Amino acid sequence: MWYSFYTKLHRPVLLRHSLPPVVFGLLLRIDLPLRNRIFRRLKLFFLVFRRLFSWFLVLLPSPRFFSPITL
């Protein structure tokens, strides 16, 4: 039993530092293929979110635009 638990734990253990312990504990209860799918979706979501957020920061007008002098 411990051996199978250890092998299940083997893959997502790399992501342990970036997840809260409660979320990680819940993900351990899900079987391996489904868990891998969830991790893949989360990774994809964060990649897309980071890219969109960086574009949003680029497209924001400069702080000078909001200064009272230009108004």
UniProtKB/Swiss-Prot annotation:
GO annotations of cellular component type: membrane
Cellular location(s): Membrane
Residues that span the membrane, as ranges: 44-66
Membrane topology of this protein: Single-pass membrane protein
Keyword annotations of the record: Membrane, Transmembrane, Transmembrane helix
Other remarks in the entry: Partially overlaps BUR6.
Name the UniProt record assigns to this protein: Putative uncharacterized protein YER158W-A
